[in-house]
Amino acid sequence: MHQVDPNLTRRKGRLAALAIAAMASASLVTVAVPATANADPEPAPPVPTTAASPPSTAAAPPAPATPVAPPPPAAANTPNAQPGDPNAAPPPADPNAPPPPVIAPNAPQPVRIDNPVGGFSFALPAGWVESDAAHLDYGSALLSKTTGDPPFPGQPPPVANDTRIVLGRLDQKLYASAEATDSKAAARLGSDMGEFYMPYPGTRINQETVSLDANGVSGSASYYEVKFSDPSKPNGQIWTGVIGSPAANAPDAGPPQRWFVVWLGTANNPVDKGAAKALAESIRPLVAPPPAPAPAPAEPAPAPAPAGEVAPTPTTPTPQRTLPA
């Protein structure tokens, strides 16, 4: 009989136990792994609102524009205030402000008259016309005051016979030209013209003296009235003005550049002192027009073209005749 090795049996039993234990462990692993693999995923924690959302492939509609609030008005007298918008609309006009003055586009302008004989020009007063000055003893311009419209087209208007204006150069025909100053010349002119145009006995009253300034040229004026001895005559009035510069002492100085205005009136048709002053101050020297420019020098005639060279013509000597002795 074969004797069984007791160690072999013990080994087989130990091996069998190990095999059974291994199989049991494998079954436990097999059951646990599928359970863990097939379980639902753990829910993700909530996403904070500040986190950026994942980009979307679809184009999202644009968000409505946020209205921009207008900037607050700058405080008055602020040293660091920003300048206003140059393109901003101007503020509305004050409804209570007075309207600007309206200037008539067709307002008549004063008529300016040249007087070549006296070498001056002046502005014609409103309501006056230029008359024929050929019969004047002194002066070179005569003005008359109109009293109405012309009776017929093309005819002169009616004029007053108790007032007139005389203008001219203060030349040697008048004693007043010898006075060195304009104030003395105006007073002397008024005295002489008063006696010439109002040769009636009376007394001078209401005498005045006025300074003149014609665009920087000084002058002076004198005014007085005459109370005639005849009570039937209205008081006479005379306004005389002298303006310009007296003659210089230089030997090569030209004629004196002084002109005068004599405005005659009466109590019935008084002198307009303001208009007389404006008339005297409107006097300007009449500047002669500049001479015509000299004609341009004629262009020199072109030089004649050089003549072609001409070959000299050979000359044949003339035979000489010998006379017998």
UniProtKB/Swiss-Prot annotation:
Subcellular location field: Secreted; Cell surface
Spans annotated as 3 X 4 AA approximate repeats of [DA]-P-N-A: 85-107
Keyword field contains Phosphoprotein: no
Residue stretches of each Sequence repeat: 85-88, 94-97, 104-107
Span list, region Disordered: 38-110, 286-325
Post-translational modification: Glycosylated. Runs as 45 and 47 kDa protein, the nature of the difference between the 2 forms is not known.
A GO-annotated cellular component: extracellular region
Compositionally biased tracts (Low complexity): 49-60, 75-87, 306-325
Highest taxon listed in the record's lineage: Bacteria
Disulfides per UniProt: none
Keywords: Glycoprotein, Repeat, Secreted, Signal
GO molecular-function terms, A-Z: extracellular matrix binding
Compositionally skewed regions (Pro residues) per UniProt: 61-74, 88-103, 287-305
Record's signal peptide: 1-39
Main subcellular localisation: secreted
Chain positions carrying an annotated carbohydrate: T49, T57, T66, T316
InterPro entries registered for this protein in UniProt: FAP (IPR010801)
Role noted for this protein: Might function as an adhesin for host (human) cells. Cell surface Apa binds to human PSP-A (SFTPA1) via its glycosylated sites where it might down-regulate the immune response; PSP-A probably binds other bacterial proteins as well.
Family: Belongs to the Apa family.
Protein's UniProt name: Alanine and proline-rich secreted protein Apa
Biological source species: Mycobacterium bovis (strain BCG / Pasteur 1173P2)
Lineage: Bacteria, Bacillati, Actinomycetota, Actinomycetes, Mycobacteriales
Gene (UniProt): apa
